């Protein structure tokens, strides 16, 4: 009897999984990173004031995840992603009764544009900005620095994803 129940459940579970997959694709659902890029961005060069920054690395990873090839030579590129601005600020959000900082807010703003190798605009200059708060413990400075770095990394990755969504929206 257990064998019969297992055999019946297995095809039903496959059928259910297939039904869910078809439903999601029919409604236009896409996994993150699967947003299509403009065809001109097949081979992209990333231009930045600091070519060794983690922001450039994050953009390169996001482009590769979407099927683009990232080149280090401008001559080989079919498109150029220009990082025009990358500003990070830190503000005090709250203090205790002694005047010691309890919470900070990190804010990052990036400005970018995409053009063809012939300098024809694909995506006009756009700005994306985001902020995140984190707790600061004066008794655990190393832990607080690690938390600040982790918040900064997730903030930057979120900004890159927002920028990629904007770039991908030009293909529609």
Predicted regions and their residues:
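Surface-exposed short loop/turn segments
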Residues: 76, 82-127, 131-146
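Acidic/histidine-rich, surface-exposed loop or edge segments in extracytoplasmic proteins
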Residues: 40-47, 140-144
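N-terminal segment of the mature soluble domain
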Residues: 42-87
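Sec/Tat-exported extracytoplasmic proteins
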Residues: 63, 67, 114-118, 138, ...
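Bacterial signal peptide processing site
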Residues: 28-31
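C-terminal/domain-edge helix-coil "capping" segments
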Residues: 142-172
């Amino acid at each position: 009897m257990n064998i019969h129940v297992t055999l019946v459940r297995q095809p039903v579970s496959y059928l259910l999984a297939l039904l869910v997959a078809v439903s999601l694709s029919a409604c236009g659902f896409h996994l993150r990173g699967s947003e299509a890029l403009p065809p001109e961005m097949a081979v992209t060069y990333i231009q930045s004031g600091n070519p060794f920054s983690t922001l450039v690395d994050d953009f390169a990873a996001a482009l590769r995840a979407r099927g683009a090839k990232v080149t280090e030579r401008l001559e080989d590129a079919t498109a150029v992603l220009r990082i025009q601005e990358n500003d990070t600020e830190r503000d005090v959000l709250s203090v205790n009764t002694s005047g010691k900082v309890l919470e900070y807010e990190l804010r990052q703003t990036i400005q970018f544009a995409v053009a063809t190798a012939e300098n024809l605009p694909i995506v006009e200059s756009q700005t994306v900005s985001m902020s995140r708060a984190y707790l600061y413990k004066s008794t655990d400075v190393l832990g607080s620095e690690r938390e600040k770095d982790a918040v900064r990394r997730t903030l930057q990755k979120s900004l890159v994803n927002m920028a990629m969504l904007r770039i991908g929206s030009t293909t529609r």
